[in-house]
From Swiss-Prot:
Family: Belongs to the TRAFAC class dynamin-like GTPase superfamily. Dynamin/Fzo/YdjA family. Mitofusin subfamily.
Gene that produces this protein: fzo1
Protein's recorded name: Transmembrane GTPase fzo1
PROSITE patterns named among the record's database cross-references: G_DYNAMIN_2
Cytoplasmic side: 1-595, 657-758
G1 motif as annotated region, ranges: 161-168
Organism: Schizosaccharomyces pombe (strain 972 / ATCC 24843) (Fission yeast)
E.C. code: 3.6.5.-
Native organism taxonomy: Eukaryota, Fungi, Dikarya, Ascomycota, Taphrinomycotina
Residues annotated for GTP binding in this entry: N164, A165, G166, K167, S168, T169, N327, K328, F329, D330, S365
A Pfam family of this chain: Dynamin_N
PANTHER family assigned to the protein according to its UniProt record, in alphabetical order: SARCALUMENIN, TRANSMEMBRANE GTPASE FZO1
């Protein structure tokens, strides 16, 4: 920046004629106004751009803060010192986070920083997310302070220094009024903030702020008003007031006045002298965001004391440039040596200040400058050079004093946000590639395995159906044949008429036993076929599941006696007399007719002629006829009936071995067929076999479904993880893009002489 408007003094003007107050000519004033307007336009542009950038970055931080609160949040910490392992693949990521500038972890145990870093690396995901939220909260608070600072058009100048260094004298000289007490002993014990009286309707007065209250000019309850003359008394009343707000009119034109400059509102803050009690408070006050410029007053006779050294070292962490005024320089005889020693100390304490020492370090005497009779003294001109440099540093270089720290912080913060986004994008892309490849491998494999297992299950299901059908058909056929053959059953020996009833019981029991044996044979057949099918199913189970534990099949435990009990009820009947008699002679007569025809055919070849037979009949028949002729039919009826009864009874007794089994068999057949015993027994045995076969079949199906469910769950988890990664990738990608745009806008803020060190 040009020096013409920045360092105007009496010694630098050409001639005495045409000079105005303090050596300013009309040309100099117009040049000052033009250059001031240009700087004000540039300042407003940069200021507005930084305000917009702060708002954008706050939105980005709030979105990050909301994101880590989500249940599907995927955040990779940037504070790890070792490589992170992927929770999706189990492999270590081939990336490491970049160094952070602003969002850093401040470890208090400096001696064991390595151990602390390892401890931070071992924290879980939730802890790192909480750390990010804490840093976001801190950054938002700082951004809010920076926003207030940039938005505020006023500038605050803190004037501090060692005890009795001349701070109050400097303030009086800068406002060209004797308002603060001056003494060789420490005077100011309360912070005094000096403003232009225009901010108080042009009235010179003091607003004393009691302890515990926050000052507001529009709220009269937050302060007490005193006349300006009472200020020299109020500065000693530390027990009553926390701060004194002073409104004063220095009566100078805008191009000369520091407070009434026509560009921005400036406040001079006169701080108590540094000592053991006040140094810490003043250092903290100097580091606050609302302090734009720190003016440090040094007693030329004492140089930098220990308290001054500590203060400058602390304040330099926030303010890279400090305006230093070496007062009482008129008391020094070897001025060059004094300058050299003080500049060497400044070089060590504040390198930024030393680099601009021509503009920021001034050797003056406030006592000499306040006496107009000392115009010819070089120290008189030096004071006005210092005043112009201070005006230039505050007004023309407000970008350096007010905007540069904001731009520097914003640049570092967007760099950290970009580091977070870029690091997370790299790791998320790594996981997305792994999950996509995993799904590419899993889906076809799952479909193929499922198709093969479905075929295996259907094959075994068909085997079960075929086995059950075969068992049912075999049982039905065997029982039907057995029932049909009951009539020809002759395994029981007949012991005579007197044992006919026992014979009937034995025949009935034998038929029951015979049918039960057929049932047992059918059960044995069902066991055999069922065992074969079970072993076949278990073989498929073992082929598909090597680690499956198969139960031992016990075929002898199949079936219960229920169907045999059903059979027994068909044999629980009483034997009657008719069960021993077969009155149906049709079949019997048919047999006799065939036998008689055969006999006559044989006898016909040997029978005598009819003549011979007739002679025989005539000789024998006549006596018989003669007998019946002499005896009536009434006398013959009883003998004939008796003979017939004897014949019938004899026939019945003779026919019991044949008739009884037939009658019992018919009764059993009728009972069995009425209840459809064969069908029910075949269904029962088939059902029991199906129950047994369904056990390994259901086990096979269950194992298949469990495997399918597990594979589907694996695929579903991978798909869900992929969706989470893709959402996170989209989120960080959008944040990264918007952050880069914000960074471009921040970099467009060009501040003269201010470089970004991040």
């Amino acid at each position: 920046m040009e020096k013409s408007a920045r360092q105007l003094s009496v010694a630098e003007q050409n001639g005495e004629s045409g000079r105005l107050n303090n050596g300013y000519t009309s040309n100099n004033i117009q040049q000052y106004k033009d250059e001031t307007n240009r700087h004000q336009f540039e300042y407003n542009q940069n200021r507005n751009q930084l305000l917009r950038s702060i708002h954008i970055i706050q939105n980005l931080l709030n979105e990050l803060d909301n994101y880590v609160d989500r249940s599907d949040c995927l955040f990779h910490s940037v504070w790890r010192t070792d490589k992170e392992k992927s929770k999706f693949s189990g492999n270590y990521y081939p990336f490491s986070p970049s160094k952070m500038n602003v969002i850093t972890i401040d470890l208090s145990l400096r001696s064991s920083s390595t151990a602390d870093e390892k401890l931070i690396s071992q924290l879980g995901e939730e802890a790192h997310e909480s750390l990010l939220k804490v840093h976001i909260e801190k950054a938002n608070k700082h951004l809010f302070s920076l926003f207030s600072r940039v938005e505020d058009t006023s500038s605050k100048i803190l004037i501090t220094g060692d005890l009795n260094a001349g701070k109050s004298t400097l303030c009086n000289a800068l406002v060209h009024k004797d308002i603060l007490p001056e003494d060789q002993q420490p005077c100011t014990e309360v912070f005094c903030e000096v403003h232009d009286a225009e901010l108080n309707d042009g009235k010179d007065c003091v607003h004393a702020i009691p302890h515990g209250l926050t000052y507001s000019h529009t709220d009269s309850s937050t302060y007490k008003v005193f006349p300006i003359e009472d200020l020299k008394r109020l500065v000693y009343e530390t027990e009553n007031w926390s701060m004194l707000i002073v409104y004063v009119n220095d009566g100078r034109p805008a191009h000369e006045s520091l407070l009434h400059n026509g560009i921005t509102d400036i406040a001079l803050i006169d701080a108590p002298g540094l000592n053991t009690d006040s140094m810490k408070t003043t250092s903290v006050f100097a580091c606050q965001e609302e302090i734009d410029v720190v003016v440090f007053v040094v007693n030329a006779e004492n140089h930098f004391t220990l308290s001054a050294t500590d203060f400058l070292r602390n304040a330099s962490t926030e303010k890279s440039h400090i305006f230093i005024i070496v007062n009482k320089f008129d008391n020094i005889r070897d001025k060059e040596r004094c300058k050299r020693l003080i500049l060497e100390q400044i070089h060590t304490l504040s390198p930024g200040t030393f680099a601009d020492a021509k503009d920021l370090v001034h050797f003056v005497s406030c006592r000499v400058a306040r006496d107009p009779n000392n115009r010819e003294d070089a120290l008189y001109s030096s004071f006005f050079q210092m005043e112009n440099s201070l005006r230039s540093f505050i007004l023309e270089n407000r970008s350096k004093s007010k905007l540069a720290p904001v731009r520097r912080y914003l640049s570092g913060l967007v760099g950290d946000i970009l580091n977070i986004c870029e690091y997370n994008i790299k790791l998320i892309d790594f996981d997305i590639n792994h999950l996509q490849q995993r799904l590419t491998d899993l889906s076809p494999k799952f479909r193929k395995v499922k198709h093969e297992q479905q075929f295996t299950y259907q094959k075994n299901e068909s085997l079960v159906e075929a086995t059950v059908q075969s068992i049912s058909q075999h049982t039905h056929s065997e029982l039907e044949d057995a029932i049909d053959s009951l009539g020809s059953f002759a395994s029981v020996k007949y012991s005579g008429f007197f044992f006919a009833y026992q014979y009937a019981i034995s025949v009935r029991d034998a038929m029951q036993q015979y049918l039960e044996e057929k049932l047992l044979e059918s059960e044995d057949y069902a066991r055999k076929r069922t065992e074969e099918a079970v072993l076949c199913i278990q073989k498929d189970v073992k082929d598909n599941f090597d680690s499956a534990v198969l139960p031992v099949f016990h075929a002898n435990q199949m079936f219960i006696k229920k169907h045999r009990l059903q059979l027994q009820k068909h044999f629980r009947f009483e034997l009657g007399l008719l069960d021993f008699i077969d009155l149906d002679l049709t079949e019997r007569l048919g047999t006799w007719s065939a036998s008689l025809s055969t006999i006559l055919l044989v006898l016909g070849k040997t029978t005598p002629s009819f003549t011979t037979l007739g002679a025989f009949t005539g000789n024998l028949g006549y006596p018989i006829f003669k007998y019946f002729q002499n005896n009536s039919l009434q006398h013959l009826l009883v003998p004939v009936l008796g003979l017939a009864s004897i014949c019938v009874f004899g026939y019945v007794i003779y026919d019991i071995p044949r008739a009884l089994p037939l009658k019992v068999a018919e009764k059993i057949k009728k009972s069995l067929r009425e209840t459809d015993f064969c069908h029910n027994a075949s269904i029962w045995i088939g059902t029991e076999s199906r129950k047994v076969l369904n056990i390994p079949l259901n086990d096979l199906r269950r194992m298949f479904h469990q495997q399918w469910d597990k594979q589907r769950e694996t695929i579903s988890v991978a798909e869900n993880d992929l969706r989470i990664c893709q959402k996170a990738r989209k989120f960080f990608g959008e944040i990264e893009s918007r952050t880069r745009e914000a960074k471009k806008k921040i970099m467009m803020v060009q501040l003269e002489g201010c470089d970004i060190n991040y």
